[in-house]
Design a protein with these regions (language model features):
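Single conserved hydrophobic/aromatic residue that forms the stacking wall/gate
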Residues: 1-6, 10
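A generic structural motif
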Residues: 16-22
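Well-ordered alpha/beta subsegment
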Residues: 25, 31-36, 150-185
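Anionic-ligand-binding alpha/beta catalytic cores of soluble enzymes and soluble regulatory domains
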Residues: 58-113
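Short, surface-exposed secondary-structure edge patches
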Residues: 95, 120-122, 163-167
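Short, Lys/Arg- and Gly-enriched loop/turn segments at beta-strand edges
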Residues: 96, 138-142, 179-185
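Short, basic/aromatic beta-hairpin or loop at an interaction surface
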Residues: 102-109, 140-156
């Protein structure tokens, strides 16, 4: 899709769907459908686009991750084990939603799947890294939320002043890198 009239075709992927908006005065319908049919025939393991990997520093636990003790207890692990598991892999961004730039990350190790809070918080600070069920993610803005928080990143994942306000795209990867409080500050 990107190779022909990229600026005239808008696409947005989610978990099980793909939205494609286009201007039929600019992009021919038959050409577009032929291109889509070719894409549908690709091996799902074949790389279609170039993904980026973002290393995101996270200060885990303490005041930065107020729920890490509960996450560890729920999993039957120590806090250190939770941190090691959470930061040991690259997470695929399945989709963005809920808030501008909120990344729904897949591939969370089953050992640290954690239920959402029974009573969501009124305010979660921007940069909070949380777990909600089988997913992990980063809150891009101060907002209400029900995910359990295990850390905080100083990286601004959403900044309306940037040329591209949202740092990530669906299909990119995030790698969490533990940092000390001194490194965080």
């Amino acid at each position: 899709l990107a190779s022909s009239a990229a600026s005239d075709v808008y696409k947005r992927q989610a978990f099980t769907s793909l939205l494609i908006n286009y201007d039929p005065r600019v992009v021919n319908y038959k050409t577009l459908t032929k291109r889509l049919q070719k894409l549908l025939k690709l091996d799902v393991n074949e790389e279609i686009s170039t993904s980026r990997v973002f290393e995101i520093p996270v200060c885990y636990g303490g005041e930065y991750g107020p729920d890490i003790e509960n996450i560890a207890k729920n999993a039957g692990l120590t806090e250190e084990e939770v941190i090691k598991i959470h930061s040991s892999k690259d997470y695929l961004i399945y989709m963005l939603g809920f808030l501008p730039g909120f990344s729904y990350l897949g591939g969370l190790d089953e050992r640290i799947h954690t239920p959402r809070l029974a009573n969501p918080r009124i305010r979660i600070p921007a940069g909070s890294v949380g777990i909600g069920g089988s997913q992990t993610g980063i809150y891009p803005l101060d907002s209400p939320g029900g995910w359990q928080l295990l850390g905080l990143t100083p990286v601004k994942t959403y900044d309306p002043e940037r040329e591209n306000p949202i740092l990530f795209e669906a299909g990119d990867y995030i790698r969490f890198v533990p940092v000390s409080e001194e490194e965080y500050l």
